[in-house]
């Protein structure tokens, strides 16, 4: 309206409509807005007006906009890069991350999704071929050289607390005819397990470093270490490309349907 008016109620009256082939007198409303005053389009007060998010100068977090009410990060499809505490973990290579930002003001809640580019340590995935495993690893950087797991390789768990994951892996390798003994982190050929914190692995993520006969598995939990061994099993034991892996699930809840009526699988395999 050109001039403001005083009103308590707003009435929408449909004077014309198209019945369509079914003869239904329906009307669709895409958007209607009423303001107590004319808003200033140059003043950003709603998260939906924000067009992009930027990374803080120190690279440790995203810069969330200053808006009325409370603004917080409530979603991330790569929490191993940007977690819900708005902490950025430097990835191996450039990563595009989708995040959801929420604005709560009085009794109103607004959300908007943004895509943010987080620069990695390396500009590309290095040399060699990215491991072909399922599910695919989130990050990979290949280095010169290859490594193999042989009968001379030892399993070194140290004080990591990941003995259960190591034992499962040891049993799996034994079923392939490869017997590995327990050892320590001084061995020249070893698979070493390390417990780490504050690297963004969460409950199920992990890191794998392969370098000239030494394979290092790091995780925050036994579950993460176990998933690392599942990736290693798929990669095999011979001529592994030297390199680094950072992996974590995109979603905390995942599932699938298995039709046991048509596909018979032993319980132990499941």
Residue spans of the language-model regions?
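Beta-rich interaction/scaffold domains
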Residues: 38-126
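An acidic-aromatic substrate-binding cleft motif
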Residues: 243-269
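Short strand-loop junctions, especially beta-strand C-caps/beta-turns
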Residues: 15-17, 158-160, 259-261
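Surface-exposed loop/turn motifs at beta-strand-loop junctions within extracellular Ig-like
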Residues: 16-18, 103-107, 221
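Acidic, contiguous N-terminal accessory segments
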Residues: 117-249
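Beta-strand secondary-structure signal
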Residues: 11, 98-102, 115, 190-192, ...
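Aromatic, loop-rich ligand-recognition surfaces of beta-strand-rich domains
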Residues: 1-39
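Residues on the solvent-exposed faces and adjacent turns
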Residues: 75, 219, 260
């Amino acid at each position: 309206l050109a001039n403001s008016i005083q009103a308590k109620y707003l009435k929408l009256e449909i004077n014309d409509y198209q019945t369509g082939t079914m003869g239904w007198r329906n009307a669709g409303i895409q958007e209607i807005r009423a303001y107590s005053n004319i808003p200033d389009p140059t003043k950003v007060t709603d998260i939906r007006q924000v067009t992009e998010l930027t990374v803080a100068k120190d690279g440790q977090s995203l810069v969330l906009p200053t808006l009325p009410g409370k603004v917080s990060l409530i979603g991330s499809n790569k929490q191993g890069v940007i977690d819900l505490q708005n902490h950025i973990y430097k990835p191996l290579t450039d990563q595009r991350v989708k995040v959801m930002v929420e604005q709560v003001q009085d009794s109103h809640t607004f959300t908007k999704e943004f895509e943010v580019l987080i620069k990695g340590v390396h500009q590309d995935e290095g040399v060699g071929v990215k491991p072909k495993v399922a599910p695919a690893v989130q990050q990979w950087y290949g280095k010169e050289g290859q490594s193999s797991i042989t009968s001379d390789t030892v399993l070194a768990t140290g004080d990591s607390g990941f003995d259960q994951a190591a034992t499962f892996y040891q049993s799996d390798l034994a079923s392939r005819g490869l017997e590995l003994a327990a050892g320590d982190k001084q061995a020249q050929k070893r698979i070493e397990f390390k417990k780490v914190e504050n690297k963004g692995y969460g409950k199920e993520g992990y890191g794998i470093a392969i370098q000239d006969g030494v394979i290092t598995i790091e995780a925050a939990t036994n579950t993460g270490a176990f998933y690392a061994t599942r990736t290693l099993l798929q990669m095999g034991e011979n001529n592994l490309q030297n390199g680094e892996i950072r992996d974590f699930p995109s979603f905390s809840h995942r599932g699938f349907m298995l039709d046991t009526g048509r596909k018979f699988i032993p319980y132990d395999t499941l």
